[in-house]
Amino acid sequence: MKGKHLRLAVALTAALLSATACTAAYGHGTQYPVQAAYAGPGPYATTTGTVTDAAGTVTYDLFYPADYAALGFKSPIVTWGNGTWGKPSDAAVFLRHLASYGFTVIASTSPCTGTGKEIAAGASYLAAQDGVPASVFHGHLDVTRVAAVGLSQGAGGAVRAATNNPALITAVETFSLPNTFWIGRLPLCPATAAGAYNPAALTQPIFFVGTHGPFDAVAASTATERAFFRSTTVHAALGLILFSGHKLADHASIATNPAGFLGYATAWLEYRLRGDATAATAFTGPHPELLSNVNWPGSAVK
């Protein structure tokens, strides 16, 4: 009977820990104020648009503040890379969320962004539009503050966009950056050389976001994300989320179930692109909030 009682106690403890983690992640901001501050919609109304090529094909989707005059600051640029077979609408909740905080987001419609070329080109397009008098973006963008952000294959593309364009990209954020074993092994992925990425070569600060989910255990495990984090010589953060939207977080959850990611993912960009001192406390100082959050076990900063 003692063995049975011990097993029951262990099971109950595990369940309570899981419930605590899930509750803490949505705990009304009393325990994790930075996460709470940026998890809800931002203060600015948003709108959307598209960029088309000469043939009329939509090449980028845009998510941006509806009234730049209301911001009181120049809008930093975020350029997004989809996961394999993905499209911007998959991550629209997250991308629109960023726009509500005053970021101008450009997202390639390509399902194959692993080379980083489309990601960098999107940032270059917006930087050029800032100087075009007839553009809605004219004079409103901070072209010196640009983040490359992506999911899975697009995460690799974000790293490549940054390492290949250090004068353009100033910060990076990745979601489930795959183990390099997978480079070139799946349909629509670039050939090995074209899609190879090396976070250790970054000169920009980076936030690696991973999960404890079963898909990521194969594609982008916590050990993989930790190894990427340790390889960098720049200011970096590693966030390993357990639950999002009261479900176990996994590989594409930033697109399919992003609620739990929004706070720290937005805070990193607020910190790195706008110098937000409140957002910075999640990642810096003697007690970074990210490291104390029970819904993000195994996280690290340096």
Name each region found by the language model.
Residues 1-10:
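Bacterial N-terminal signal peptides that target proteins for export
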Residues 10-20:
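Bacterial N-terminal signal peptides
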Residues 26-73:
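N-terminal cap/lid segment of alpha/beta-hydrolase-fold proteins
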Residues 68-74, 117-156, 163-164:
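Gly/Ser-rich "nucleophile elbow"/oxyanion-hole loop immediately N-terminal to the catalytic nucleophile
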Residues 72-83:
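Short beta-strand element of the alpha/beta-hydrolase
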Residues 89-107:
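Short amphipathic alpha-helix adjacent to the substrate-entry channel of hydrolases
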Residues 167-255:
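The feature captures the conserved acid-bearing segment of alpha/beta-hydrolase catalytic domains
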Residues 244-302:
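Alpha/beta-hydrolase-fold serine-hydrolase catalytic core, especially in secreted/extracellular enzymes
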